[in-house]
Amino acid sequence: MGFSAGDSKKGANLFKTRCAQCHTLEEGGGNKIGPALHGLFGRKTGSVDGYAYTDANKQKGITWDENTLFEYLENPKKYIPGTKMAFGGLKKDKDRNDIITFMKEATA
């Protein structure tokens, strides 16, 4: 299974409770504990200016889209061994679909 469009409102709530403490979405939001996510879709891993990525993130060599995020957000440390992202992941497909749908709207 891969990504399918979800509920943006539910995704916004998930982002607020699971992601916002470490990431910003808005343009010019800047890096926090994690890199800024504005413009995420279509961007290569490990490429936000001013953020200190691990070599694992820089060398992963993928471009973020709905399907790569769907896989990554299930278990970040499995998808990119060596990432410093401490988040354990979203195990439910529906939660990942909702948050990706929201992020796609919020980071465009």
UniProtKB/Swiss-Prot annotation:
Q: Which UniProt keywords apply?
A: Electron transport, Heme, Iron, Metal-binding, Methylation, Mitochondrion, Respiratory chain, Transport
Q: How is it modified after translation?
A: Binds 1 heme c group covalently per subunit.
Q: Name one GO molecular function term.
A: metal ion binding
Say if the entry is tagged with keyword Nucleus: no
What is the gene name?
cyc-1
Q: Extract one GO cellular component term from the record.
A: mitochondrial intermembrane space
Major place of localization? mitochondrion
Q: Where in the cell is it found?
A: Mitochondrion intermembrane space
Q: Which residues carry this modification: N6,N6,N6-trimethyllysine?
A: K77
Q: Which GO terms describe its biological process?
A: mitochondrial electron transport, cytochrome c to oxygen; mitochondrial electron transport, ubiquinol to cytochrome c
Reported function: Electron carrier protein. The oxidized form of the cytochrome c heme group can accept an electron from the heme group of the cytochrome c1 subunit of cytochrome reductase. Cytochrome c then transfers this electron to the cytochrome oxidase complex, the final protein carrier in the mitochondrial electron-transport chain.
Q: Name the family the entry cites.
A: Belongs to the cytochrome c family.
* Sites where the protein binds heme c: C19, C22, H23, M85
This chain's source organism reads Neurospora crassa (strain ATCC 24698 / 74-OR23-1A / CBS 708.71 / DSM 1257 / FGSC 987)
UniProt cross-references to InterPro entries, sorted A to Z: Cyt_c-like_dom, Cyt_c-like_dom_sf, Cyt_c_1A/1B
This protein is called: Cytochrome c
Q: Does the keyword Cell membrane apply?
A: no
Going by the entry's taxonomy, the superkingdom of the source organism is recorded as: Eukaryota
